[in-house]
């Protein structure tokens, strides 16, 4: 099957109202491909574990026109599509059934390929960064595994939108240190004002790749003040979203964005987040995914 044809079926599957990531994962586990889901009978859908109401949603949605329109829109806007079978996805990510099976992005995904030539000697011994090196000046820090000899380490740096100058300096210093310890590190954040923006900017300044997970379509800049920053992120990394182009910012989208930051990260730093900060949901998701 041609790639565009495959993507059309993924767009169809992820666009079915009432069929979220958990059901999408279930269907793909049983039927293997979204095309097979498209052609499945009601009996087969029920046997796969779908409730009768959800099976009806699938059957009533059998029309690929909308999916083809979205694909064409993505091509015009320079948006790439990435399924959970892409090599950028780790095995650990594929095992989480509440994560999207399809994502939309802007930027340079080829820089995140395991085979990407970054001009870095991956045989060198980088600075070990275990518990004895825990940065005490940060509000919270945790890791999934030791940093030693770990190429393409994904490090989340998140925190308050309204942060102090001291928190800003902590953020910038931490990103710089991450790059010194591991020049192949990938800095992940949420593209928001405050710590998120400083983390992305510091990553770019220190020659690191960076990923911004957003709660809008990847073609939308939120906040608007970050238009220039988002352009830079697209040049030095990726902007990723589970939402199609044209999707506006809704409050409910940001906790969902936070779970992506947490799931994609091997290590996380939380800086300047208050007790009621939304950033703490990112920490909670990290603890969930990395138990």
Each model region followed by its residue ranges:
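Short, small/acidic-rich helices and loops at N termini and domain boundaries
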Residues: 1-88, 127-134
């Amino acid at each position: 099957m041609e790639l565009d044809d495959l993507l059309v079926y993924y767009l169809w599957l992820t666009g079915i109202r009432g069929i979220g990531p958990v059901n999408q994962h279930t269907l793909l586990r049983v039927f293997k491909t979204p095309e097979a889901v498209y052609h499945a009978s009601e009996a087969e859908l029920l046997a796969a574990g779908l409730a009768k109401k959800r099976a009806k949603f699938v059957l009533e949605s059998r029309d690929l026109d909308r999916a083809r329109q979205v694909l064409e829109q993505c091509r015009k806007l320079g948006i790439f599509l990435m399924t959970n079978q892409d090599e950028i996805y780790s095995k650990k990510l594929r095992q989480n059934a509440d994560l999207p099976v399809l994502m939309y992005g802007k930027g340079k995904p080829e820089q995140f390929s395991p085979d990407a030539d970054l001009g870095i000697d991956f045989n060198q011994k980088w600075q070990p960064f275990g518990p004895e090196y825990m940065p005490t000046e940060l509000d919270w820090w945790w890791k999934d595994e030791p940093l030693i000899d770990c190429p393409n380490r994904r490090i989340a740096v998140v925190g308050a939108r309204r942060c102090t100058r001291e928190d800003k300096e902590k953020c910038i210093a931490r990103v710089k240190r991450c790059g010194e310890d591991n020049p192949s590190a990938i800095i992940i954040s949420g593209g928001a004002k405050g710590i998120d923006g400083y983390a992305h900017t510091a990553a770019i300044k220190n020659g690191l790749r960076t990923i911004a997970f957003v709660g809008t379509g990847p073609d939308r800049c939120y906040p608007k003040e970050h238009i220039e920053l988002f352009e830079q992120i697209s040049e030095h990394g990726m902007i990723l979203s589970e939402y199609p182009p044209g999707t506006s910012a809704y409050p409910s989208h940001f906790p969902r964005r936070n779970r992506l930051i947490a799931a994609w990260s091997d290590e996380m730093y939380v800086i300047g987040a208050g007790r009621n900060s939304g950033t703490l949901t990112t920490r909670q998701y990290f603890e969930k995914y990395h138990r």
